[in-house]
């Protein structure tokens, strides 16, 4: 399968400003706020100029029941913190309550996460983008009738079902530290979806993903599991990921790829035990992108939220084939990234328990399984079912140039490289970074002493205007789908 290096591809990105408001509860490791932090960081890096940004629609119950059972989705729609006592039996039945708590706006959170992934799949199907990104998606543990591992609705399965309307074969790759059990289970008996998961195995949630789990029936050999031990580093991960994925591409020949980019496989994750850097993690994105296939990039796990934001911002830049500086731009959550205020992280000194012999042995076993695959299966394509989302109306070329264009249309426009000056320094004084942030703190008190009250008033007004700018920009980017 042809590989290309550094090809610029069209990218669209889904984000809803409300997603950061949802709260699983005190002490719970899953924090949707990390999606807002990611969005704010990539805005301040200026990445929004190079891609189309959409606000996802809220997926409805009908869309969700394309995979999930009716009674499970009905339960998720009905349950609230104030009526939990009426649902105690169902909570047990659907595994809701501990890891997967009931919180305010639970169903709306699922709607946004799912809406972004399904809309991304529709965009890819219509060839309106090459890469679609939804960092609020990637909730890979949810089952047909059960919540699991902080996941309630499996947006990945629903997005893959949408892709299968147009694509004969879809490849799913999971680089979260946890096994992608919910997605594997959904497609365990089909040869149209291959699931490939690299994960920690052995006394670790969810406890599945053994090397010998290879699929069943028509799906035999279409589930690929690479069980790993603690402490895997960039070098070892790259040494297994590239050859395995090359062989998978050669044997399966997919026409679309879904990549779950769970960042709990990074060094220093609150729940993880791997030792990958952001660059090592992103090498997987880069490699999959090089096959030049329609690609859906999703979030997933990630519990040290400052590193989640760093990782997904950098991987958005990789998708855009854009280099961004290691020095973080000033942003709404700047203090989270101290004391170094840098984009990239260093690995720890933990031991890599994955010996070369162990990794080689697993790799050879997987190659043997992949050799058992028949040549890429042919599928008799039938009439294409209706898209999950109605087509957007209006042709930009036919619009009257004298009329003001809608916010939706203007936000879909991508700026040409030459349209802006080389400098990203917006506003007087330039874009703030760590050094002038610290300097500003030092001289603040001296400045205040010197200024007369009238001058102070003027400065306050100016600062107020500057502070409002990024927020306005963020709102501008959140576009409603037609």
Curated annotation (Swiss-Prot):
Reaction(s) the record says it catalyses: N(6)-acetyl-L-lysyl-[histone] + H2O = L-lysyl-[histone] + acetate; N(6)-acetyl-L-lysyl-[protein] + H2O = L-lysyl-[protein] + acetate; N(6)-(2E)-butenoyl-L-lysyl-[protein] + H2O = (2E)-2-butenoate + L-lysyl-[protein]; N(6)-[(S)-lactoyl]-L-lysyl-[protein] + H2O = (S)-lactate + L-lysyl-[protein]
Residue ranges, compositional bias (Acidic residues): 390-400, 417-427
Record keywords, A-Z: Acetylation, Biological rhythms, Chromatin regulator, Hydrolase, Isopeptide bond, Metal-binding, Methylation, Nucleus, Phosphoprotein, Repressor, S-nitrosylation, Transcription, Transcription regulation, Ubl conjugation, Zinc
Annotated region described as Histone deacetylase, given as residue ranges: 9-321
Keyword Nucleus assigned: yes
This protein's GO CC annotations: chromatin; cytoplasm; cytosol; heterochromatin; histone deacetylase complex; neuronal cell body; nucleoplasm; nucleus
Subcellular location: Nucleus
Annotated positions binding Zn(2+): 176, 178, 264
Residue positions, PTM N6-methylated lysine: 432
EC code(s) of this entry: 3.5.1.98, 3.5.1.-
Start and end residues of each stretch annotated as Disordered: 390-482
Name of the protein in its database record: Histone deacetylase 1
Taxonomic source organism: Mus musculus (Mouse)
Taxonomic lineage from the root: Eukaryota, Metazoa, Chordata, Craniata, Vertebrata
Gene name as annotated: Hdac1
């Amino acid at each position: 399968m042809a590989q290309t290096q550094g090809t610029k591809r069209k990218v669209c990105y889904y984000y809803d400003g409300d997603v950061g408001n949802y709260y699983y509860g005190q002490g719970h490791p899953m924090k949707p706020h990390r999606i807002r932090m990611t969005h704010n960081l990539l805005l301040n890096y200026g990445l929004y100029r190079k891609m189309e940004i959409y606000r996802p629609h809220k997926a409805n119950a009908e869309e969700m029941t394309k995979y999930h059972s009716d009674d499970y989705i009905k339960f998720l729609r009905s349950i609230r913190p104030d009526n939990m006592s009426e649902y105690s039996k169902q909570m047990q039945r659907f595994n809701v309550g501990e890891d997967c708590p009931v919180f305010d706006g639970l169903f709306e959170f699922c709607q946004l996460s799912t809406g972004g992934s399904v809309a991304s799949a529709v965009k890819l199907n219509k060839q309106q983008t090459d890469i679609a990104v939804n960092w609020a998606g990637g909730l890979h543990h949810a089952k047909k009738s059960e919540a699991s591992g902080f996941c309630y609705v499996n947006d990945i399965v629903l997005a893959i079902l949408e892709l299968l309307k147009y694509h004969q074969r879809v490849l799913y790759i999971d680089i979260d530290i946890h096994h992608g059990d919910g997605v594997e289970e959904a497609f365990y008996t089909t040869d149209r979806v291959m699931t490939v998961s690299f994960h920690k195995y052995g006394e670790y949630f969810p406890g599945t993903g053994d090397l010998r789990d290879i699929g069943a029936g028509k799906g035999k050999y279409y589930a690929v599991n690479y069980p790993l031990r603690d402490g895997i580093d960039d070098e070892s991960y790259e040494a297994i990921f590239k050859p395995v994925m090359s062989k998978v591409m050669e044997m399966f020949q997919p026409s679309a790829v879904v990549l779950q980019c769970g960042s709990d496989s990074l060094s220093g994750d609150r729940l993880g035990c791997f030792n990958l850097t952001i660059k090592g993690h992103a090498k997987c994105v880069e490699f999959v992108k090089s096959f030049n296939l329609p690609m859906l990039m999703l979030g997933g796990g990630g519990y040290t939220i400052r590193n989640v934001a760093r990782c997904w911002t950098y991987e958005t830049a990789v998708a855009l084939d854009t280099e961004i500086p290691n020095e973080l731009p000033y942003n709404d959550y700047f203090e989270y990234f101290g004391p170094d205020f840098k984009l990239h992280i260093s690995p720890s000194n933990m031991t890599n328990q994955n010996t070369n012999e162990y990794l080689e042995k697993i790799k050879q076993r997987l190659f043997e399984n992949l050799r058992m695959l028949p040549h890429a299966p042919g599928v008799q394509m039938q009439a294409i079912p209706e898209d999950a989302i109605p087509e957007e109306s209006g042709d930009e070329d036919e619009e009257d140039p004298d009329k003001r264009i809608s916010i939706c249309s203007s936000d879909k426009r991508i700026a040409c490289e030459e349209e802006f000056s080389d400098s990203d320094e917006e506003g007087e004084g330039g874009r703030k970074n760590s050094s002038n942030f610290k300097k500003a703190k030092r001289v603040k008190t001296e400045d205040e002493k010197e200024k007369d009250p009238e001058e102070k008033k003027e400065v306050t007004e100016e600062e107020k205007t500057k502070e409002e700018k990024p927020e306005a920009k963020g709102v501008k980017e959140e576009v409603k789908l037609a």
